[in-house]
Amino acid sequence: MGRFRQARGGQAMLETVLAVLFITLMFFALFELSRKVTARILADHAAARAARAKAVGFNDFMCLKSARVALIPVSGRRLWPQEDGWNEVSRVPIYLSAETEGQARAILEYEWWNSTDISVYSGSGLGATAECDVSLRTDDYRVEGRAAVESHFPLYMFDQGL
């Protein structure tokens, strides 16, 4: 009987190691899933911001800047400026007021902004829809967000003859 107990002496430790390994793998899988879900939610939000910017009459560059600002949490490492994050919030309004791409890059630039494809489509006339597709390419996966907003700016920008 004593020999039988000695042969099973490490079973509890082996079960514990396997359980900890399984729990760790589950944690990392859930963490990766949460990263992907967050990126998808933010891509949809960025598409909605760009579509809204187009719906109120902004140009394509302003739509691009609006979507990029919405994607800051999933845009990777900040390339410019290379300081701490304390001044990032104060740079966003300055970035949005930039008139050219070069001027905008001198204010804020992130690692994955170059690989972000933002397309804004708008119809013509009354009741047009602004649609936006945001494709965010990170190191290991691609996320797409879509949004559509009814365009109201023709009501306010053009004389309706009333």
PLM region spans:
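Short, conserved structural patches
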Residues: 56-162
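Alpha-helical assembly-interface signal, strongest on the long, hydrophobic N-terminal helix that forms
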Residues: 2-80
